Regions:
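Flexible, charged surface loops at secondary-structure boundaries
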Residues: 136-141, 164-165
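Active-site and donor-binding regions of nucleotide-sugar-utilizing enzymes
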Residues: 126, 150, 159
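A structural signal for isolated positions on well-ordered beta-strands in alpha/beta enzyme cores
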Residues: 10, 143-145, 171-173
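Basic/charged alpha-beta structural segments of nucleotide/phosphate-handling enzymes
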Residues: 1-138, 187
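Short, solvent-exposed loop/turn segments at secondary-structure junctions
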Residues: 17, 150-151, 177-179
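Conserved P-loop NTPase "ATPase switch" module shared by AAA+ and STAND
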Residues: 139-152
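Conserved RecA-like helicase ATPase core segment
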Residues: 156-192
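A short, structure-level motif marking secondary-structure boundaries and short turns
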Residues: 96-97, 144-145, 178
C-alpha cells in the first residue's frame, strides 16, 4: 500500500522543486550569476560580437540599456527561443526588423556561450531542471497535484512534460469561468 496524507506531501514552487531535485540528484553546488554578474556577462557578450552587429553596433553603455536587453533575453529564454533561432529568423527577415533579430541572436548566442563556460544564468533553471528530470526519476510513481497556475510558459512546459512522463498521476486545478470571452480574466486558463 502506498503512503498517503500530509506527512508525505511537499509543496514546491518551480524554484524550490529545482533546488530539491538538484540537492538529491546532484548539481546544486554549481555557481549561479546574480543580477550584477548577469549584466557584466551581457556587456562582455555584447562587446565580443560588436564588430558583427548592425543595429546594436554602437550600443549604449548605460545600465538601463543592458537591463532592457537582459529583460528581452529573459523573455526569450522563458519561451525556449535560442540565439541561433533568432539569428536564422533575422537573416530570413528583410529590413530593420531582420537586422534587430539577427543582432539579438548574435548577442544572445555570445551570452549563452559565456554562461556555459562559467556561472549559470538563473533563467536557465527550469531548462536545467527538465534536463535533470530526464535522467533522475524524482516523480517516479508519485501522485502530483498542481494548483495556483493559470498558464505555463514553454520552459515550464519542459518540466511538466517530464513530470507527466514519470508520475503515477497528475491532477491540475485551474481557475476557470464559464461563458467568458477570449479577453476575459480566465482566458489563459482556458487555453491551458
Amino acid at each position: 500500500m502506498r503512503p498517503s496524507g500530509a506527512p508525505y506531501g511537499e509543496v514546491l514552487s518551480f524554484t524550490r522543486l529545482e533546488n530539491r531535485v538538484l540537492s538529491l540528484g546532484g548539481g546544486a553546488a554549481e555557481p549561479v550569476l546574480d543580477a550584477g554578474g548577469r549584466l557584466l556577462v551581457l556587456y562582455a557578450a555584447l562587446r565580443s560580437v560588436q564588430a558583427n552587429l548592425t543595429v546594436y553596433a554602437m550600443p549604449s553603455q548605460k545600465p538601463a540599456f543592458l537591463t532592457s536587453l537582459l529583460t528581452t533575453l529573459d523573455e526569450l529564454k522563458s519561451y525556449c527561443i535560442t540565439g541561433e533561432q533568432l539569428t536564422q529568423v533575422g537573416e530570413e527577415t528583410e529590413g530593420m526588423d531582420g537586422e534587430k533579430l539577427r543582432d539579438l541572436g548574435l548577442i544572445f548566442g555570445a551570452y549563452e556561450a559565456m554562461t556555459a563556460r562559467g556561472a549559470l544564468d538563473p533563467r536557465d533553471r527550469l531548462t536545467r531542471l527538465a534536463e535533470k528530470l530526464r535522467r533522475f526519476p524524482f516523480f517516479q510513481g508519485q501522485d502530483v497535484y498542481l494548483d495556483g497556475f493559470t498558464d505555463f510558459t514553454p520552459q515550464q512546459g519542459l518540466v511538466l512534460a517530464e513530470l507527466l512522463r514519470q508520475a503515477h498521476s497528475v491532477t491540475l486545478a485551474l481557475t476557470y469561468g464559464e461563458g467568458a470571452g477570449e479577453e476575459a480574466v480566465f482566458a489563459p486558463a482556458r487555453k491551458t
